[in-house]
């Protein structure tokens, strides 16, 4: 299992822990309980927004999910985070846990932000 997969597995665990959902139910489309859907939405949103997995790429992690379902879950979760304080609070708790989970000795997110900053700097230099 590579580092990226370890981070993704940890994200699944954290989202399931927050909503007390079953991992198997989250990854399959056989359970429509509220906790399962909330954990699934958070996990899909995280994969799309933070791990940069496109909607078609979600098929690797979920049984029988299509891109339209992925788009719906991302948009719905984004709306809920912006609208409901409890969802926003849960997501902040999730992000805090994910930032603690470090595979590189330092924070994964901090290094990713630094890489993006450096890439932008390189683009600016080459365009000048």
Residue spans for each PLM region:
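Short, Lys/Arg-enriched anionic-surface-contact patches
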Residues: 14-40, 65
